[in-house]
């Protein structure tokens, strides 16, 4: 939970406070490399999350994909992209630890298994947990009217003027996140 909530945000904070203000030419020079790494992170993290049978690994791989979108926003060199990256980082800092808590602390303590297929029918036995898990999964998916959606939209819209291909490849995270969340 600490990794998803805090440690991943240290890199974002470091890029915002140190790298972009002190080395703006280097950021613009290496932005194609960073954008490529962000797209690879989005696609690889999402496809790996689709194949997971372990709930905690699924949440971890979704975090990798979301941080790829944050990198796309940070290195878009636009105000909209950077604002979207900040918003997505904050939203991810609330949603991802909540999912880790629900999977690790609540379900694993009761069933001693993290295999997804063993969790069928939990709505009958744990209705409050199911409602909370549904809420945070919908937020993690980036559905409209959630902060994750606004952050993803701003990040990808910030990348679009500079590099439409990267923005479209990054937008695959929207479809793939729906696939692994369902």
Which role does the model predict for each range below?
Residues 1-153, 157-182:
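Hydrophobic transmembrane alpha-helices and their helix-loop junctions in integral membrane proteins
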């Amino acid at each position: 939970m600490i990794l998803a909530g805090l440690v991943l945000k240290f890199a974002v904070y470091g890029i915002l406070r140190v790298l972009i203000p002190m080395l703006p030419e280097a950021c613009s020079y290496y932005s194609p490399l960073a954008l490529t790494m962000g797209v690879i992170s989005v696609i690889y993290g999402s496809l790996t999350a689709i194949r997971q049978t372990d709930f905690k690994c699924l949440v971890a791989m979704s975090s990798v994909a979301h941080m790829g979108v944050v990198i796309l926003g940070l290195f878009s060199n636009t105000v909209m992209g950077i604002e979207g990256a900040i918003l997505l980082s904050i939203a991810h800092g609330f949603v991802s630890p909540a999912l880790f808590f629900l999977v690790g602390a609540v379900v694993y303590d009761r069933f001693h298994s993290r295999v997804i297929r063993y969790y069928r029918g939990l709505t009958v036995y744990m209705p409050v947990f199911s409602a909370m898990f549904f809420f945070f999964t919908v937020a993690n998916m980036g559905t409209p009217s959630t902060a994750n959606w606004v952050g993803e939209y701003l990040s990808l819209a910030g990348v679009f003027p500079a590099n439409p291909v990267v923005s479209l490849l990054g937008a695959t995270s929207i479809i793939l996140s729906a696939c692994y969340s369902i």
